[in-house]
Amino acid sequence: QQEKLYHLGAKRIARSTLARINEEQPASLYQQLFSQLLQHFENAKGTHKFRFKNPLYSLDASHIDLSLSLCEWAKVHKSKASIKLTVGLNHSNTIPEFVALGDGIENDMVQGRTLKFPSGSIVVFDKGYIDYQWFAEMTQQNISFVTRLRPKTVYEVKSVHKVLACKGILADEYIELSSEHAKKRGAPKLLRRIEFYDVQKRRTFEFLSNNFHLAASTIAAIYKDRWKVELFFKAIKQNLKLKSFLGRSRNAIQTQIWIALIAYLLVSFAKHMAQEGWSVQRLLRIIQVNLFERKTLKALFSPDKIPIKQKEAQMSFLL
């Protein structure tokens, strides 16, 4: 790429220069830019694969590893340092619609409960986000949740419902959490327990939800669809330079993370416009390889649809 920088009339930018910019420029600037871009992309929402129309989100967090010797402020324990990225991923367009950055040592719930999901939405998350008081708050706000039931959870079965064993459903029960801890935290009066056998994994799963309208098989399928948020974390870590950082301070690290999220947002929008069925990971790799090429995004993402220009007569020999 060095020759192309030369032909552009651009000089090589020193790593120290970029690091200084990341140190001095407030991370909140890039956070606001991400939020503004997100508003522009509201009309680009697609649809998730389920029949219901409710917005579906996956809530999850992932550690972004840092150097303990360079980032002492991010210390988790004596041999690890990290910052935690929490997202609420919209399943309709695989865009992180809700984002929070916190210390790696924090419990997942610290940032998780700060995300304000819209009324009527469905949120799916793992057992790291079990908080009975939060469950009650979501129920009051008309937000449905789907999660795993923790082992040894104390509950009382209030009613049992018919199940379709052919779809892997072993039990569909309405339950009341009866432990002292659940009562103290103000858990919802009634919840739904679904027992599901996964043929592929040969495992039985127990799900907990406050949604009493969807089919039990749909509840199980919603939790299985949570893998999309894991693909999101994999994509940004592998393709958007979140393994090495320019700068050591909290501000510099957060700045680079927000820039990576902005890049992911732009590529996701380009993916929606291209409508080629390509993954965000593939589009990111194409952009990296062609970063200094004189091509439009349309030409990169839909090369077969761009007509080949005929040679000009002036540049041809008459034979």
Regions found by a protein language model. Name each.
Residues 38-45:
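Primarily marks folded extracellular/lumenal domains of secretory and cell-surface proteins
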